């Protein structure tokens, strides 16, 4: 359960840094108001699962030039190292690392 809570917290913080607002947890997922320019969302949308889904994390990694270095027991994304055993799978460990490094980049730029 702790990993799920960490993932939700990471996605929420990243969404805030990317300009989302009015973010709320609904049944283990996050919904909120996307950044300006997302008029088709009618004011509310599902926050992408950057910390757990490649469909969301992949484009994020490309947009923020995150180099991914997979390994046998640990992997890193943009220099943020993760231990696979702390996550449900190697994939979720790496997507979590992508979210964390992008959060760090955005927070540092503020």
Q: What annotation goes with each model-predicted range?
A:
Residues 1-110:
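Glycine-rich anion-binding surface patch
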